[in-house]
Amino acid sequence: MKLWLPILLAVFVIAAVPVAEPPVWKAGAASAKITPEKAMWMAGYAGRTKPSEGVELDLFAKAFVLTDQAGGRFVLITMDLIGVPRNLRLAVAERVKKEHGIEPANLAINASHTHSGPELRTSKIHGTDDLALREKEAAEYTAQLENTLVRLVGEALQKSVPAHLDYSTARCGVSMHRRTPDGKGGWSNFPNPNGPVDQTVPVLKASSADGKDIAIIFGYSCHCTTLGHQKFSGDYAGYAQQEIEKAHPDAVAMFANGCSGDQNPYPRKTMELAQTHGKSLATSVQAALETHMQRIKGPIRAAYREIPLAYDKLPTREQLLEEQKSTNTWQVTHATRVLQRIADEGPLSTTYPYPVQVLRLGNDLTWVTLGGEVVVDYSLRLKQDIKDPIVWVSGYTNDVMAYIPSLRIWQEGGYEGGGAMIY
């Protein structure tokens, strides 16, 4: 009996060891620096009067490729930039399909919306002495960016290995509603602690079969506007990614901005605050990683539509000519630009091809991406209406053309409710 006792104990010990769950995905990620190599005009603030003056924090583009057991794929690209020009998305999607067989519906490109990155869209510039130079620099940068994004997708595919995918969530208090009644029937851009927010931090981690980190993808609904200086920087989102990659050196950290149209980080204005906000967000991500994360299964299902979103009212020629007499330089620029477009291309379109995309991972996670500067009402409403276990909502994806107000904000007016269109 004494001889059998060690054998029986060994059998029980072996039986008690859990069987490792085999990976059901393949995943890979890649990253590249996209900081301009020379001074450029910066995007985000209309009041800037000169080009950039150095680098505070490098800008990055990153790609994540997920493959299910049936060979279905999904690609997420994130960028430390103001937005996603429509033509860039179309060009990258076409090349990714041609080179890798991935359908455009299965590609999402999200911008962090940092206001400390290079100018990509020059269509709203008019009448400046250096217009031709600014257009040339923006076009050259965007062409180089296109090549980088396509290359990153290929690198992420090459690096793909069998992987697990896990999800959790946390909260972060950096954001605050930024629309405050001005006492005169309007709205000012000012912190409003009583306004709606979505301070959820969704986190998706891809790891290899042996537990090595591949990618840590996280989201948050907040403008990247802590900073207002003349140096390139990813703002708080860039610092958050930096902190996560320090703590997880094998991982590519990727930030997907949410519905941030009416959300700002507070307090603002200094590099130290951007770093503090970034560390706060990174701490929330780490908290999510330390929970009992939910294992995500496949398959991948994705859908993409460009809906004909109708404009409210198109300006008449008479209204535009009257606007050209304004003392507001931006109104004059807006009117002149629209008149020139009518002269070159004919009548204005009555609709805009607005991108809406849905990614579903099995029956576990539904990720909705929307174009433009979407206000937080959309995130809150979609999470309420969609009954799936996990709902993740991102704005600033596939095209960033304008603010997208909710009906409430449209009726209230103000900057996000139509006032920003001249910029």
Residue ranges: model-predicted function:
Residues 2, 7-23:
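Bacterial Sec-dependent signal peptides at the C-terminal "C-region" and cleavage site
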Residues 21-110, 114-252, 256-276, 289, ...:
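Conserved beta-alpha junction segments in alpha/beta enzyme cores
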Residues 281:
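Anionic-ligand-binding alpha/beta catalytic cores of soluble enzymes and soluble regulatory domains
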